[in-house]
Structures are given as structure tokens and as C-alpha cells.
Amino acid sequence: MSDPDLNHARHSLATLEHLVVQDIFMTETAWLADVVLPATAWPEKTGTVSNTDRMVQLGKQAIDPPGQAKADLWIIQQIAKGLGLHWNYQGEHHGVAEVYEEMRQAMHAAISGITWDRLQRESSVTYPCLSEEDPGAPTVFIDHFATDDGRVHLVPADIIPANERPDSDYPFVLITGRQLEHWHTGSMTRRATVLDAIEPTATASMCGADMQRLKVGLGDVITIASRRGHVTLRVRRDDGTPQGAVFVPFAYYEAAANLMTNAALDPFGKIPEFKYCAVAVHAGGELSLNAGFGVNA
């Protein structure tokens, strides 16, 4: 459901001969799997996470995993063993320290100074960090950029019209995204009692002027349709939404916004136009069953 081109994703998954999914929850994708490998959550395993803020963070196992859930590294090594590979990592937590040392050697230009022992002491270190005495670099490009003259090169961008613009049949622009209470597809947050109580159902946001023009009120059922798919959900007023646009979060499987997106590519950057497409909005429609993920599911 998180794939921004959901029609393509569903078609591709349906054509597979065998699908294996590793996850901590039975997600929409996991329900399609032939085999589900139950994984462990962050506090149930020891390992590192490297973020886009250039930080390597150590996480230590704090609690035992439930049921048959296993750590990622254990699962990977069992698959490798089944494929005839002779991996023999030694040490605690299935040899996670040895695996990290392999990563450090492969990424020596960035994290050579971040040893496993150092992470045990400091918990997290920012890279690039090239020696154990190096404190790390929270900010990069302070003195110069990686260009021939050391200066940043700014290039003015020309506005290119969208591939699919509103017309008489599809007069609105669809914007998809996240909302405060639910992360991505809600596989975790919709199981959180408090968060799910705040935002339990799928809604579309429109400004008051557009709602008045469509003759719909707060909480009314509307149907949003593009040339590729449609969803039915309730409408809420948000005057922060531009006139002529409708915002739909993609956290709800019962009203999957990514069924409607446009996969056309930008002619230069080849970036899909998933965040902009033309849609029609009509009052009424039949809501899909909202079963929720269930807190204990």
C-alpha cells in the first residue's frame, strides 16, 4: 500500500510465483505472502541504524521478542544457509559485531573511525568519521563544496507543466501524503490505541469554498476518481488546502490514495509525478469496510 503506484505494485505481486515477506506485523503485503518470516522490533534486537542525517546509532536488545519472532540477522543467515552459503559469524546476537565490522571496512571512506567498541561507549556517532579521535562531522560543506572551485553552483529551474493537468472531466488536483497521527501506511500507528482514536478513519481535506461548490458538508461521503482508480471516504474542511486541490493521506488501506496517482516521468530528472494528478470529486459513494488493524492484531 505504501508504493506510490499501487496499481503497478499489486499487479507485480500478483504475478509472482512465490512471495516471502519479513515483517513485525501482518501488513497488506504480508497477507499476500506464501511465507511470512516474523521479525523483531527495534527494542527486541541488537544492531545499528544509519540515518540520512549521517548518524550511526547503536540499539541494544532490551526485551525478548514475542512468539517465533527472530532478529533480522538470524533470518538472513538461515536463508543464506538454505542457499548453500557458509556464513559463520561469531559472537553475541548472531555475530552482529562481525557484520558491522564488514560494513565499516566497506564504507571506510565514511565510517572507518566508528568502531563497534566506540558505539558501545557513545551510542551514536555522526559521519564522516575517519579515525577514533575524530568526533564526527555534524555539519558538512562548512568551508567548501565538492566542486572544482569549491563553491556551490546554483542553477535556475524552468517550470515544466505537469503531465496531467485539471480539465473539465477531472477538475481537481490530488495531493497525497502523510498526516501527523499515522506513519506511512499505519501498520504501526493504527495499532496504537491513542493515535487510532484520534484519526480512526480515512478522510479527504478540501477548502470550504470547494466543499460549498460541491454541496457537501463536514463528514459527508465523497468519491475521488482519477483516470487510474478511485476511493470513497469522508470529507473534512481544511482551508489550508488550496482551492482546486484535495489532500488524501495514504495511511488507510480501505481508501488507498495511491490507487489514483500518475506515474508519468519528468523528462529530465525521470522522477515520477506521484504527487500531482487530475481527479474528479463527487458527493456520495459506498464506503469500504473499516476494520482497522486492531491493537492486538
Model-derived features: positions:
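Phosphate/diphosphate-binding loops
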Residues: 8, 16-18, 22-27, 61-81
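Long, contiguous, secondary-structure-rich segments that constitute the structural scaffold
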Residues: 66-122, 185, 189-205, 209-297
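Long, low-complexity segments enriched in small/aliphatic residues
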Residues: 96-194
